[in-house]
């Protein structure tokens, strides 16, 4: 049996909000498997958390750049927020996003590409910047979206400068409609993605493993009610619909009015969403408490 360490118990407590003894029991029952322990607690009704809290650890900036029918987004990390406010660093993030527009989203290809206005590559310019500022930096990831007709809109939450911030979103909108209207729609959808953090564009693209895991947890929760299997099945179906409303962009409630569905808004605009990307600075690495981005975006949309 795996050793149940204090650190493991602490991590499970922070992730789920469950009590120490419940966390110890969950880890014992699941042989120290953290993910399985989270599910065990949820099945017992002892966890309010449906997923790990993606705490933010890295500093730096997310940057976007656009061209007709395409857009790129990069995340460049630094050690401190002080560097993120440095104009040289900000310029590097902006130029790196522009390079990604040309060479694509492969980070190694971006690093090997010429850095605009110099005889250096992007990687060499980064090394030069590290030596100049005296702090380690890294191009963490990049994403490029394109459409054959329409726009790829971008949205930066609370930008420190145009195209630079800590949360960035790209939204691919296909349509023959007027470009300015599509850009407005795309920006509104971008705010939706920033606030609601969907995992999938539509129900067909939901991770099958994640869906089966959710069904298993919901079924166990429903069975705890003691109701007949036929009723349990209906309960699970309803809860899966609710799950889709949380994780699927097109099924979500439109944050701008609190009533409509995203899919209805897009359809009424005569458009089709073909993809989206969301970068949150340092996503997936734990740190201290972060601000409520959903509330901030709602405020920016005039709904708070």
Curated annotation (Swiss-Prot):
The keyword Cytoplasm applies. This is Elongation factor Ts. It comes from Granulibacter bethesdensis (strain ATCC BAA-1260 / CGDNIH1). GO terms for cellular component: cytoplasm. Its main location: cytoplasm. Belongs to the EF-Ts family. The keyword Cytoplasm applies. Associates with the EF-Tu.GDP complex and induces the exchange of GDP to GTP. It remains bound to the aminoacyl-tRNA.EF-Tu.GTP complex up to the GTP hydrolysis stage on the ribosome. Residues 80-83 are annotated as: Involved in Mg(2+) ion dislocation from EF-Tu. The gene is tsf.
